[in-house]
Amino acid sequence: NFSSCGYVPKKNNKRANRIEWEHVVPAYVFGIFFSEWTVGHPKCVKKNGKKYKGRRCASKVNKEFKRMEADMYNLFPAIGEVNGLRSNYPMTIIEGEEREFGKCDVEIKRRKVEPREEVRGEIARTYMYMDSVYPGKGIISKKNRSMFEEWNRSDPVDEWECERARRIERIQGNIN
C-alpha cells in the first residue's frame, strides 16, 4: 500500500508491489572473497556440462558462504523495486536530495546508495557485525569505516532493534 508510506514506484513493475529480504551487506561484497564465486568449482556444472561460478556456485558448495548469505542479522525487508535498483552498490552520502521514490527517502545515484537517516545506524551496525563475525572478507573498507562509525553514533540502537536481535539469536544461535 503505497499511500501508507508515500512510496512512488520508479517503474510500474511487479517488484514495486512486493517486499523482499535484502542483504544490507550485498552478497557480492563478501562473495568475491570465495574462489567458488570467482573461478568456480568442479561441482558447479550444469546438466549440459557447462561450468558456472558466482553466487550460485558459492551457495552450492561453500558452507561459510552459505552461512554468510543466510545470516539473519544481514537480512532486512525492502521494497522489491528499491532492492533491485540498489543492486550491490555501496552505501554512502549523496549530495542533494533528489527523491526518485516519492516520500521514500532513499537515493541511488552513480552506482551508490544513500539510505534514510532513520536506518543508517542499523545499516552501520549490520556492516560492523558482518565485519567482526566474518573477518578478512572486505566487509568494511578503510574509506567507509569512519562513515559507519558516525552513522552508528548518530542513530542509536532502539528497542525494536534489540527485540529483533533477541529473536534472531533464538533462531540463529548467535548474538549480535
Q: What spans do the regions from the language model cover?
A:
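N-terminal module-boundary/linker segments of secreted carbohydrate-active enzymes
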Residues: 1-12, 176
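Domain-level detector of nuclease and nuclease-like folds
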Residues: 12-176
